[in-house]
């Protein structure tokens, strides 16, 4: 069975067997504890096994995976510590993506694909507004209308508002103040660059599953230096991607080597102020997506950043350092 060497402590090797890779994991530790280094090791080793992956690059640290490294004093010292005589430097196949379409390959998603639950989270809607948005999606579906971009959704909201009496029989009262609040939130999202993200053509799943001539899986890197300043768009897109994989990939059951790996950096951003409905959807997706051959890894400072409903599904737990007893218990 293939395995990945993660590190060593007190002459004990830490190995991750490939059969555990689709049972998900978490990497925790404070700033400077080498969480990103650990993540990059996993990305490299997964690539060698032919496993494509998707990772959010928060500070530009992951881009170097596409370049061949070179030896220096720190690396020599590290090799001695690990009792490794040699180390082969190599560049890994990478693909760069960008929601804001500034430098890399554009990443797009239609409003219909995002769905009302995740979109309500992006917009920060309350319970009443979320219910109205959900009704608008249902009405559009009944009328065979595809909501491709923000303009489509705005037009649909205005249409429903203007004909509220007609729809109130089946969907309840849709107060104009609530509709206006949703429209204001959409306007703010548009100003943040949401009009670039919510458009077509959408990403093709096959573009993420590529391998190079050596059989190495591509590491798909999402540029997040700008995206990190838009936490609602960041969290919504990554959750959409996870749902997209789950809904699109066929069932394959437990496999010796997973088909794909997904890395959520700054995982706390996914769960800040999350609704119970969306959390329940994420928990279900994480629990079931392993049968699609997908491994999911969360990277964050504190293991308590990840809700218990999610962390209970994570079998591989790597911690650089843990201070509080409550954190140690979670890991």
For the regions a language model picked out, list residue spans one by one.
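Post-Walker A alpha-helix
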Residues: 38-39
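N-terminal pre-Walker A segment at the start of P-loop NTPase domains
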Residues: 1-13
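Conserved small/polar residues in nucleotide/adenosyl-binding loops
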Residues: 325-331
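Conserved lysine of the Walker
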Residues: 35
């Amino acid at each position: 069975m293939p395995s990945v060497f993660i590190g060593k402590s007190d002459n004990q090797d830490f190995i991750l067997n490939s059969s555990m890779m689709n049972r998900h994991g978490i990497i925790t530790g404070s700033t400077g504890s080498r969480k990103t280094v650990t993540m990059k090791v996993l990305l490299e080793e997964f690539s060698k096994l032919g496993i494509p992956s998707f990772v959010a690059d928060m500070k530009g640290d992951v881009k170097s995976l596409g370049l061949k490294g070179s030896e220096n004093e720190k690396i020599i010292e590290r090799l001695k510590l690990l009792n490794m005589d040699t180390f082969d430097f190599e560049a890994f196949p990478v693909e760069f993506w960008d929601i804001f379409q500034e430098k890399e390959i554009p990443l797009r998603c239609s409003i219909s694909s995002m769905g009302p639950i995740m979109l309500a989270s992006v917009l920060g809607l309350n319970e009443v507004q979320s219910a109205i948005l959900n009704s608008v999606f249902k009405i559009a579906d009944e009328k065979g209308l595809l909501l491709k971009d923000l303009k489509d959704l705005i037009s649909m909201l205005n249409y429903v508002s203007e004909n509220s009496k007609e729809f109130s029989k089946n969907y309840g009262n849709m107060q104009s103040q609530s509709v206006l609040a949703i429209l204001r939130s959409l306007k703010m999202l548009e100003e943040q660059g949401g009009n670039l993200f919510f458009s077509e053509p959408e990403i093709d799943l096959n573009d993420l599953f590529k391998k190079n001539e050596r059989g190495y899986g591509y590491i798909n890197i999402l540029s997040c230096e700008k995206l990190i300043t838009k936490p609602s768009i960041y969290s919504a897109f990554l959750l959409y991607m996870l749902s997209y994989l789950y809904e699109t990939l066929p069932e394959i059951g437990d496999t010796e080597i997973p088909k794909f790996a997904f890395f959520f950096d700054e995982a706390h951003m996914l769960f800040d102020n999350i609704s119970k409905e969306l959390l329940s959807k994420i928990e279900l997706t994480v629990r079931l997506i392993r049968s699609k051959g997908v491994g999911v890894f969360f990277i964050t400072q504190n293991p308590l950043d990840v809700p218990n409903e999610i962390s209970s599904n994570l079998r591989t737990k790597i911690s650089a350092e843990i201070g509080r007893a409550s954190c140690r218990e979670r890991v």
